[in-house]
Amino acid sequence: MLRYCQQDVEVNFKLYKHFQRLIESPLWQRALRTEHEMVTISKEMHDNGFYFNIDEARRIFNEITGQLDPLDAELRESFPPRLKLLREITPKTTKFGTLSRTDFRWMKDGDLSDYSEGAVFSHCEWEPFNPGSPRQIVDRLNAAGWRPYEKTKGYIECLRTIRNKWASPEERQKAEDRLPHYEKYGWKVSKDNLDTLPATAPLPARRLVHRLLLAARARTLTEWFNAYNEQTHRIHGTFNHIGAWTQRMSHNGPNMANVPTEDPQHPDRSIYSNAMRALWSVPLGRNLIGVDAEGIQLRILAHYMNDRRFIHSVTSGTKEEGTDPHTLNKLALGDVCKSRDDAKTFIYAFLLGAGVEKISAILGCTLAEAKIARDNFIASYPGLLHLKQDVIPRDAAQGYFKGLDGRFVKCNSEHHMLAGYLQNGEAVIMKEARILWGRELKRLQIPYLSVNFVHDEWQTEASDDLDVCRKIAEVQADAIRIVGEDLDLNCPMAGSFLNSHKSLAIGQNWSQTH
């Protein structure tokens, strides 16, 4: 045991020496200090836990599961059984001149009078609709006008193998043989894909989507039940302060970043969203405070573009005057963009690296029209054009980009580079702001419990004194502005403590503070 202890010390020392140049480099000092402090904060949030309304969660779960069996019966009636080919059979004879029964074991009566040697026939069976079968789901939705764009991992890997010049001929041939299957069935049954089902689709297809959403809600609740602590009445999730490749925080046990949220454009697909978010709450006599960064990814994009018109639009533009970014983006996209809401959906998808297929689904247009709209949008902002044509290719060629705080983030993909800039920038700003407001509240001697940190949002539990809660919210929101100034960004950052209904984000549960 002592030898292993000595070995651990030796390995750690060699590891330290390996990274010493980076550790002592001025470029990394700010990032290293931030991430080391975030380790402590992540552990603190895990230990605090998030209060959870288990009784209401069980009621919702029972309500959801009680709808599934009747809905499955309705769908089996709406989608009649289909004839499924099991195999092609060529009857053979035995040495006695009779047909071999090897290929007829499935027959109940054993009557082979309708079959003869060498006469090929198809062995089929009726297949009832199974709402749990991805293949059958895709078949029925495709027939209803579904236009999915999110591929499964298998489909993506198949395409990579075909394009990989290092793949062996056998590997490439195998992938090419599987490609027709993936082209038909290689689509995720995800919310984004389900949203592409037209509103005019036949009722059975829409009921199928409803069933899929209910089942997803039930799975999420099951995950929460498994994580619930009966002693503390809380869920103690794990926060990995640098879990994603963009160095955003990741969450597991359960994934507290994957809580349903309302979708104004698809209210029928937001079922139970508010009710499930409301399960995350506070004990009696306490308040929950929600603070987030105002349009942080658009502001970071404005920083990188350094375009005065876009910066003004993001920070001061209004929907009423038609000077906000979503209205301007609608004009930049051209006639194919029918509404401001579509322009809003487009920009956030574009920032995450959406391809032409996804843009086509968002705008409800052809692939050719989507490509023209995207190109029009990029060309309308010189700063964005410079990013796309010069900065991104340069960073992809060198295999990394430099973050706002000096850290190097590995990325050699032009397709993912813009999302990397924005998500890493968001992570840097929000982490530094979290550290800053924690220090300030300690200085002010204001007690609080930090219970969640998701991307650009914090949830904090505090006393039921509204003045204290408002002070906490003000300190948190102001920390975002201060960090933006300290990083010397081209576009000002701002925090907000208003919820989605534009009222003060102080309440009894997460649905009231989000």
Write out the residue ranges for each language-model feature:
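Short hydrophobic/aromatic beta-strand micro-patches
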Residues: Q459-S463
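Conserved "right-hand" nucleotidyltransferase catalytic core of DNA-directed polymerases
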Residues: M1-D268, G285-N287, Q297, G364-L367, ...
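Conserved catalytic core of nucleic-acid polymerases
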Residues: L331-P447, N452-F453, D464, F497-H514
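Short, conserved charged micro-motifs
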Residues: D465-I472
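A structural signal for short secondary-structure junctions
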Residues: S281-L284, R443-I446, V451-H455, L487-N490
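A common structural junction motif
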Residues: Q476-L487
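Function-dense linear segments that define catalytic or interfacial modules
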Residues: H241-C337
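Interdomain boundary/hinge elements
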Residues: I311-S316, A373, L384-K388, D486-L498
